[in-house]
Amino acid sequence: MKSTYDILKERGFIEQVTDEALIKKLFAAGKVTCYIGFDPTATSLHIGSLVPIMALAHMQANGNKVIALVGGGTGLIGDPSGKTEMRQVLTRDQIDYNAQCLGKQLFQYLDFSDKKALLLNNADWLTKINYIEFLRDVGRHFSVNRMLAAESYKIRLEKGLNFIEFNYMVLQAYDFLHLFQNYGCALQMGGNDQWGNMLAGTELIRKIAGKDAHAVTFPLITTSLGHKMGKTEKGTIWLDGG
């Protein structure tokens, strides 16, 4: 019998995996809890979001537990992955409103009844972090040299990467740890541009919890110029045309 991972691979969803043998073993052991993050820097998701949404739908249809994580906390910083310039900084009110809009959209694609899927917002835990404790307990597990070598930062290093953006990888990794510890989530999925951030999460879980966690990336939907289809690209096709 095919696992959900086999189905996703056959349908062309899989780009990179941390360890395919271990991921297949994870799916063979039973139902899997996975999560995908959604960036609330606009009031609507776009066509590039359909790949991760469809992946969650496949996971759910095959009896797995899915978590849609809206980045109400990380959105206050901005993800530098694949960007040549710093993102526009949005206010807390703007981020909160965008997060509500994305949540409503996700309810159209996933079944959240009876906790079949969970809609979470990382602002619920990231905004409550004690900075000194976070540096001591989490930050010490990160190598600056390895972070600077990550593809997600290479482009920005040429034009300037500020300290706020440099923290993004650490916060996303902490999200994975939080979901692993509190929801039994052992699999993160997302776009291929998130590979470095996702690996940081699996490493953090291994160092703090002493357990295996896994990551799977999807191919990116690109524009005619080969750029990632994102919220700031010209000609973006929004899922909510309004």
Predicted feature locations:
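A charged helix-plus-loop insertion that forms the helical arch/lid used to bind
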Residues: 80-96
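Non-catalytic terminal extensions that flank enzyme cores
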Residues: 1-40, 240
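Short, flexible loop segments at the rims of nucleotide/cofactor-binding pockets, characterized by
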Residues: 12-15, 44-45, 166
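N-terminal catalytic cores of NTP/NDP-binding nucleotidyl/phosphoryl-transfer enzymes
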Residues: 22-80, 188-195
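Short acidic, glycine/serine/threonine-rich loops at helix termini
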Residues: 78-82, 129-135, 227-233
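Divalent-metal (Mg2+/Mn2+/Ca2+)-assisted nucleotide/phosphate chemistry catalytic cores
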Residues: 11, 91-92, 98-100, 104-222
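Catalytic adenosine-cofactor/nucleotide-binding cores of aminoacyl-tRNA synthetases and other
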Residues: 140-143, 219-242
